[in-house]
Structure formats: structure tokens, C-alpha cells
């Protein structure tokens, strides 16, 4: 992935640009990852920074990928969003300042949060590709899952 943000932005699809740079929202149930159930991580489409893990993904029946927590809270920024006559908490990536989606206090995890994220803001890296794509440090997340299932 190139280090020049302008070059990376030129590589985005129209929808990816609309979502990440113009705070857009893709259609529910008509996006790449809402129903994906593979093990892996979801990275920022612009910066490539890891944002979410499939281990924290759940079906919120909303039509967008939903997660109970970020894989690295330091890569997430939350901002007040009063657009469209609503009061919500917007979620942005810290490194690329990309709009990702919103976080709501109605999730199933211990913190009760639901990170509702646009697929267009993400790129999925399957567990088996983590090493070769430079995300080897995240393999251990899935090794813990495997050892937890065996005990």
C-alpha cells in the first residue's frame, strides 16, 4: 500500500470515496461484508491500519458489518454527529481520518457497544493471509480462539 494518501484516494471506488471522504453511507444488505463470516481482520481502506476483527463481529440485523469493539482502540476516533436531524456518535479512523460509520449503545458485548461500519471503508484480510500481507501480529488472536475452543 502506497504511503501517499492522495495516491491511495485515487485508487478508491466511487462508493469508497463517498463513504470515507464525504461521510456517506452505503446501502444496507447491499455491501461486501455485512454477511461475511470468515476469520480475519478488517483494515482501513485508505491507511491499511487494522480496525476490527471477525472475532468481534456479530449480526445486528442492520445490513452493515457490526462489531463489539475495535481491534485497536487507538486507531478509532469518535465524534458527535448531528447530521440528518439525529444525534449520533460518528466513528473515524485516526490515521487516515476516514469516515467509517457510527457506534451505538445497543451491542451485545460487555461494553454494550455496536460499531456499525460501512463495508466501503474496510478491506478484509483473511486469517490465512495475515502474515503475507504484513499483519502477522494479529495471527495470535485466532490462535487464542482455537486454543479456547479446544479446552
Swiss-Prot record:
<dbReference type="InterPro" id="IPR002579">
    <property type="entry name" value="Met_Sox_Rdtase_MsrB_dom"/>
</dbReference>
<comment type="similarity">
    <text>Belongs to the MsrB Met sulfoxide reductase family.</text>
</comment>
<dbReference type="GO" id="GO:0005737">
    <property type="term" value="C:cytoplasm"/>
</dbReference>
<dbReference type="GO" id="GO:0030091">
    <property type="term" value="P:protein repair"/>
</dbReference>
<keyword id="KW-0560">Oxidoreductase</keyword>
<protein>
    <recommendedName>
        <fullName>Peptide methionine sulfoxide reductase MsrB</fullName>
        <ecNumber>1.8.4.12</ecNumber>
    </recommendedName>
</protein>
<feature type="active site" description="Nucleophile">
    <location>
        <position position="116"/>
    </location>
</feature>
<dbReference type="GO" id="GO:0033743">
    <property type="term" value="F:peptide-methionine (R)-S-oxide reductase activity"/>
</dbReference>
<dbReference type="InterPro" id="IPR011057">
    <property type="entry name" value="Mss4-like_sf"/>
</dbReference>
<dbReference type="GO" id="GO:0006979">
    <property type="term" value="P:response to oxidative stress"/>
</dbReference>
<dbReference type="Pfam" id="PF01641">
    <property type="entry name" value="SelR"/>
</dbReference>
<dbReference type="InterPro" id="IPR028427">
    <property type="entry name" value="Met_Sox_Rdtase_MsrB"/>
</dbReference>
<feature type="domain" description="MsrB">
    <location>
        <begin position="5"/>
        <end position="127"/>
    </location>
</feature>
Amino acid at each position: 500500500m502506497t504511503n501517499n494518501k492522495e495516491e491511495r484516494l485515487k485508487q478508491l471506488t466511487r462508493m469508497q470515496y463517498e463513504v470515507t471522504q464525504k461521510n456517506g453511507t452505503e446501502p444496507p444488505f447491499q455491501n461486501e461484508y455485512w454477511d461475511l463470516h470468515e476469520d480475519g481482520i478488517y483494515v482501513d481502506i485508505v491507511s491499511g491500519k487494522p480496525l476490527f476483527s471477525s472475532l468481534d463481529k456479530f449480526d445486528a440485523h442492520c445490513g452493515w458489518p457490526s462489531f463489539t469493539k475495535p481491534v485497536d482502540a487507538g486507531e478509532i476516533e469518535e465524534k458527535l454527529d448531528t447530521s440528518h436531524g439525529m444525534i449520533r456518535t460518528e466513528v473515524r479512523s485516526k490515521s487516515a481520518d476516514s469516515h467509517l460509520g457510527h457506534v451505538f449503545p445497543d451491542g451485545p458485548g460487555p461494553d454494550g457497544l455496536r460499531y456499525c461500519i460501512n463495508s466501503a471503508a474496510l478491506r478484509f484480510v483473511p486469517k490465512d493471509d495475515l502474515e503475507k500481507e504484513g499483519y502477522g501480529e494479529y495471527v495470535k488472536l485466532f490462535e487464542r480462539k482455537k486454543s479456547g475452543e479446544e479446552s
